């Protein structure tokens, strides 16, 4: 059996970083995202990859063509695949629950990579141009600290921290 490096996606959004790593042969252990709509997109993409890997893309086509509902579509997918998408806002208050859920998904296996890009509105050039003083009080400025907590806890071989200026 070929080893597939395993990764965790934080601040996952609709899964752009995940998509690249999945296509490169990595296994997604979990995605943490606060936006419900983005979580549905992540679940759909994870379902697509599972169906592709199991030669069942006809089911994906049925869903895209609205021949089956989202719930019917999800019935084809193992719970562990859909359950890898965790709908949380990453904060000091939610970290214990997130760690508990991620720990369960990681299990005894290694976590090779953590990827993620916290929201950058608070300190991007565009965000700062709206209000220099508001930047200091914006809690999004400090989300990198939570990312660092995941690095300390899981000690991956690699990490990708994406952001913009």
Residue positions per predicted region:
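Conserved active-site and SAM-binding loop architecture
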Residues: 1-165
């Amino acid at each position: 059996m070929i080893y597939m490096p395993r990764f965790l996606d934080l601040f996952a959004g609709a899964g752009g970083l995940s998509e690249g790593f999945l296509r490169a042969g990595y296994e997604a252990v979990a995605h943490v995202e606060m936006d419900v709509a983005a979580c549905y997109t992540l679940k759909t993409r994870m379902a697509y990859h599972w169906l592709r890997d199991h030669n069942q893309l006809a089911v994906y086509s049925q869903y895209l063509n609205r021949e089956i509902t989202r719930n019917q579509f999800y019935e084809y997918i193992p719970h562990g695949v859909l359950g890898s998408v965790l709908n949380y806002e990453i904060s000091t208050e939610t970290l214990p629950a997130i760690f508990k859920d991620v720990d369960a998904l990681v299990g005894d296996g290694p976590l090779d990579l953590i990827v993620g890009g916290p929201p950058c509105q608070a300190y991007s050039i565009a965000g700062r141009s709206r209000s220099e003083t508001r930047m200091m009080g914006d809690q999004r400025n400090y989300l990198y600290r939570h990312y660092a907590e995941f690095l300390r806890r899981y000690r991956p071989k690699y990490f990708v921290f994406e952001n913009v200026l």
